[in-house]
Amino acid sequence: MFYITYKSDGTTACKKQISLSRLTEVGKTFKTPIYKNLEFAFTTSTYSTTGNTYVGIHSKKNDYIEPYCNLTVNLDMQLGKGLAFIDVNNADRDLLLFLEEQGFIAPTGVTMPSEFVVYPLYRLNLNKIGEYKF
């Protein structure tokens, strides 16, 4: 069995038990040379305010799945399908480089400042990202 840890109300940690057979039917995971003891997968959705693509990364270690980081950030502008600003302020730089090398994301050369951070716009390989889910 696997357990997903999440915060149902923003403060209270909850666990949900999921069978291994159910997880393996859904998708696959990837590993990085940086974090050899973790497996990763993606979560996708859309931001309600702009309709832009949201991508989150979850990690699995010792049968526990938990949120690792938000790959994307929602800035106040609508983007085309498969485009997203990458959260370079909170996501691990080495992980972002790995995702780029593996073809999950590709830089466009466009950036957008927001507060004290300049976010790069990336093209998302949504087909490939969609294969890697818990």
Predicted regions and their residues:
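OB-fold ssDNA-binding interfaces and closely related basic DNA-contact patches used
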Residues: 4, 9-62
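Short, compact, well-ordered microdomains
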Residues: 88-134
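Short non-domain terminal segments
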Residues: 28, 33, 38-40, 66, ...
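Short linear motifs in intrinsically disordered/low-complexity regions
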Residues: 10, 38, 71, 75-77, ...
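Residue-identity detector for glycine
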Residues: 9-10, 27, 51, 56, ...
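Acidic, aromatic-enriched beta-alpha/helix-loop junctions
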Residues: 53-103
